[in-house]
């Protein structure tokens, strides 16, 4: 008998992966968490039936959400990660010696515990001495943080439903602005522009960021296991433009080995398809 994981992208579209084994299933006070093993994508973790991370393509998401802001400001020292319980974003941040402090705020401890056991490709740097883990609500953590206390905030959240909903609110973005330094950058995952539900949330988030931050841009990556494969990220800043202020030479001198991100991809990721540009221009 064959076992398949199937995720509903829309009422009319589903995405399936043939599964060898269902490695873990559990329910925290917030959400359902599952881990599967497959031939094509290796181990993968889902939350409430939605794909979060796979062994085969996780590097794309984690490199793009991390290296784009870092290559824009190589002087970043204090970083706040909201969500990111699998640890992949922290892993990429830990590669920068200039970073002194990484605070990771994950509402669901079970996500971290399960990732440590099954998704070690991502969670391998959560014990870095610069990393502090906080198991609490990210919205409240940001609200209580001191002014100008972080150089970079990465919102590595689930979709804007359930526990992740508040991380797409105007009040949350205003608090992020307040706790960022003058050269501070906020990056978030911004859903897909392709299917209507994802596109609606993407437009809402982008509109809110534009109202709060002087610089607000959108960039993209191809992530095969996310709905449509076309995924967007938001980049918001008080001063720094990710294209004009890209420190290509400085970043390349670090000689970081990557699988997806490079200096050309950095620039190219901001060159959006026409239909996405038009969506973002809609009031």
Curated annotation (Swiss-Prot):
Question: Can you state which reaction this protein catalyses?
Answer: S-adenosyl 3-(methylsulfanyl)propylamine + putrescine = S-methyl-5'-thioadenosine + spermidine + H(+)
* EC nos: 2.5.1.16
Molecular function per GO: spermidine synthase activity
Q: Name one GO biological process term.
A: spermidine biosynthetic process
Q: In which pathway does it act?
A: Amine and polyamine biosynthesis; spermidine biosynthesis; spermidine from putrescine: step 1/1
Classification via PROSITE patterns: PABS_1, PABS_2
Q: Which CDD domains match?
A: AdoMet_MTases (cd02440)
Known Pfam families for this protein? Spermine_synt_N, Spermine_synth
Annotated PABS domain ranges read: 2-238
Q: Which UniProt keywords apply?
A: Cytoplasm, Polyamine biosynthesis, Spermidine biosynthesis, Transferase
Location (main, coarse): cytoplasm
- Can you list the GO cellular component terms from the UniProt entry? cytosol
Q: Where in the cell is it found?
A: Cytoplasm
Q: Please name the InterPro entries in this protein's record.
A: PABS, PABS_CS, SAM-dependent_MTases_sf, Spermi_synthase, Spermidine_synt_N, Spermidine_synt_N_sf
Q: Where, by residue number, does spermidine bind?
A: 62, 86, 156-159
Domain of life the protein comes from: Bacteria
What is the purpose of this protein? Catalyzes the irreversible transfer of a propylamine group from the amino donor S-adenosylmethioninamine (decarboxy-AdoMet) to putrescine (1,4-diaminobutane) to yield spermidine.
The record's comment on protein family reads: Belongs to the spermidine/spermine synthase family.
Matching PANTHER family, A to Z? SPERMIDINE SYNTHASE (PTHR11558:SF11), SPERMIDINE/SPERMINE SYNTHASE (PTHR11558)
User: HAMAP family from the xrefs?
Assistant: Spermidine_synth (MF_00198)
Subunit details for this protein? Homodimer or homotetramer.
Name-wise, this protein is Polyamine aminopropyltransferase
Originating species: Clostridioides difficile (strain 630) (Peptoclostridium difficile)
User: Upper taxonomic classification of the species?
Assistant: Bacteria, Bacillati, Bacillota, Clostridia, Peptostreptococcales
Q: Please state the gene responsible for encoding this protein.
A: speE
């Amino acid at each position: 008998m064959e076992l398949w994981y199937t995720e509903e992208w829309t009422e009319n579209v589903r995405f399936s992966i043939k599964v060898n084994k269902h490695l873990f299933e559990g329910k925290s006070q917030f959400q359902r968490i599952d881990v599967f093993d497959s031939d094509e994508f290796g181990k993968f973790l889902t939350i409430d039936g939605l794909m979060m991370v796979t062994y085969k393509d996780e590097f794309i998401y984690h490199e793009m959400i991390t290296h784009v802001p870092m290559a824009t400001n190589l002087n970043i020292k204090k970083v706040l990660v909201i969500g990111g319980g699998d640890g992949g974003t922290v892993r990429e941040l830990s590669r920068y010696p200039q970073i002194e402090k990484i605070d990771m705020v994950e509402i669901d401890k079970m996500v971290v515990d399960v990732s440590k056991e099954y998704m070690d490709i991502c969670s391998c740097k959560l014990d870095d001495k610069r990393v502090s883990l906080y198991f609490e609500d990210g919205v409240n953590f940001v609200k209580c943080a001191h002014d100008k206390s972080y150089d970079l905030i990465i919102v590595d959240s689930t979709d804007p439903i359930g526990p992740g909903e508040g991380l797409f609110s105007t009040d949350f973005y205003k608090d992020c602005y307040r706790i960022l330094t003058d050269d501070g950058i906020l990056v978030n995952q911004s859903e897909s522009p392709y299917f209507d539900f994802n596109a609606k949330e993407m437009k809402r988030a982008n509109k809110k960021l534009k109202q709060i931050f002087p610089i607000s841009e959108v960039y993209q990556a191809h992530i095969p296991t996310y709905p449509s494969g076309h995924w967007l990220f938001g980049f918001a800043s008080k001063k720094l433009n990710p294209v004009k202020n890209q420190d290509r030479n400085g970043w390349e001198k670090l000689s970081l080995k990557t699988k997806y991100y490079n200096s050309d991809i950095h620039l190219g990721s901001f060159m959006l398809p026409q239909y996405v540009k038009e969506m973002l221009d809609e009031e």
